[in-house]
Amino acid sequence: MRILCTNDDGIYAPGLEIIEQIAKDLSDDVWVVAPEHDQSGVSHSLTLNDPLRLRQIGPRHFAVKGTPTDCVIMGSRYILADKAPDLVLSGVNRGRNLAEDVVYSGTVAGALEGTMLGLPSFALSQEFSMETGDRPVWETARTFAPQILRRVIEIGIPKNTVVNVNFPACAPEDVAGVLVTRMGKRNLGFLKIDERRDGRGNPYFWIGFEKADDADTPASGSDLAAIAGQCVSVTPLRLDRTDEAFAAILTAKLK
């Protein structure tokens, strides 16, 4: 099995080393094609107005000056043009990709691109807490991912479906279980604009985040609830975002 690994945190991110280790538990034919620089939050963007720069940094290791989407296309259609990958793994992201995160996430987008290209794909993310800070417990993802991937691959991923896996911010021995979940929803009040001033007094801005009022009470069965309960969350996501129920209403009313 040929595996293509990518991420959005960049070619030198610790999580990329973890996902390569996970991939090597499944196969000895593992290739890494990741962004030259951090691409967190770029979503499913595609580079069209600038050239892509490709740099080989080691055996089967390549850096692309582009997005995770660019990396998956470059990996599958150019670097591995002789024999396409059988599996795409994107991650392991530093931080969770739950609920609305999946819309912004370059990690999830890398897996979505793999799915669009007809390749079974997973996005993997490791939550971290205030206690762990800059030191996510990578061993949790490292411990649980191989067995989850093997089982899902054995079952078979439906066409046009990507599997989003999130690992809780706790040691492997403290994980409460593995749950199949649905995409959750947050109170979007967590987004804010942080205004500051530079040395000349000119304003500049950061998009910031703050805890929402309902952050501690996620809906039962959601990815948010699973992670809050120290469980691994496995969420199948579909490429087809059609709202079938509303489409039926529109069909009846727009005649």
Curated annotation (Swiss-Prot):
Organism: Nitrobacter winogradskyi (strain ATCC 25391 / DSM 10237 / CIP 104748 / NCIMB 11846 / Nb-255)
Location of this chain's protein in the cell: Cytoplasm
Cofactor remark from the record: Binds 1 divalent metal cation per subunit.
Necessary cofactors: a divalent metal cation
Protein name: 5'-nucleotidase SurE
Top-level class of the enzyme under EC nomenclature: hydrolase
Keyword set, alphabetical order: Cytoplasm, Hydrolase, Metal-binding, Nucleotide-binding
Family: Belongs to the SurE nucleotidase family.
GO molecular function: 3'-nucleotidase activity; 5'-nucleotidase activity; exopolyphosphatase activity; metal ion binding; nucleotide binding
Binding-site residues, a divalent metal cation: 8-9, 40, 93
Catalytic activity, reaction form: a ribonucleoside 5'-phosphate + H2O = a ribonucleoside + phosphate
One protein family per Pfam: SurE
Enzyme Commission number, as recorded: 3.1.3.5
Xref: InterPro entries: SurE, SurE-like_Pase/nucleotidase, SurE-like_sf
Function: Nucleotidase that shows phosphatase activity on nucleoside 5'-monophosphates.
Superkingdom to which the source organism belongs: Bacteria
GO cellular component, one term: cytoplasm
Gene name per UniProt: surE
